[in-house]
Amino acid sequence: MSSKREIRWGLARIYASQNNTIITITDITGAEVISKASGGMMVKADREKPSPYAAMLAANKAASDALDKGLMAIHIKVRAPGGAGPKTPGPGAQPAIRSLARSGFIIGRIEDVTPIPHDTIRRPGGRRGRRV
């Protein structure tokens, strides 16, 4: 008898801003966090937090923790700050996705979940702008 092992799916959420990259791997419902890591946890200097190298290290750490806990396949959701901030992901998004793919996961789908306003939104700083 060949007993086929059921594949355990999860969600990898990548938040890539200009200041940091945060990777959170949850179960398929998103309710239980299995592992998380950020670029700031991997490097010493603050200026290196948003770097692609820090994002790659963070994705490797989160992936190894999730693989140890039995996760085999993931769907990836990439998010930029959005809203009043930039709508494009930061420099760590691509290396994080590549690192998750190389770590041995089965990749289901990759989607962008950046919040985009459907009307205009008021920028921070007020009517007279940011006074320096």
UniProtKB/Swiss-Prot annotation:
It comes from the Archaea. Keywords: Ribonucleoprotein, Ribosomal protein, RNA-binding, rRNA-binding. InterPro entries: Ribosomal_uS11 (IPR001971), Ribosomal_uS11_archaeal (IPR019961), Ribosomal_uS11_CS (IPR018102), Ribosomal_uS11_sf (IPR036967). One of its GO terms (molecular function) is structural constituent of ribosome. The keyword RNA-binding applies. Signal peptide: none annotated. The keyword rRNA-binding applies. One of its GO terms (biological process) is translation. PROSITE patterns: RIBOSOMAL_S11 (PS00054). One of its GO terms (cellular component) is ribonucleoprotein complex. Belongs to the universal ribosomal protein uS11 family. HAMAP family: Ribosomal_uS11. Part of the 30S ribosomal subunit. This is Small ribosomal subunit protein uS11. The lineage of its organism: Archaea, Thermoproteota, Thermoprotei, Sulfolobales, Sulfolobaceae.
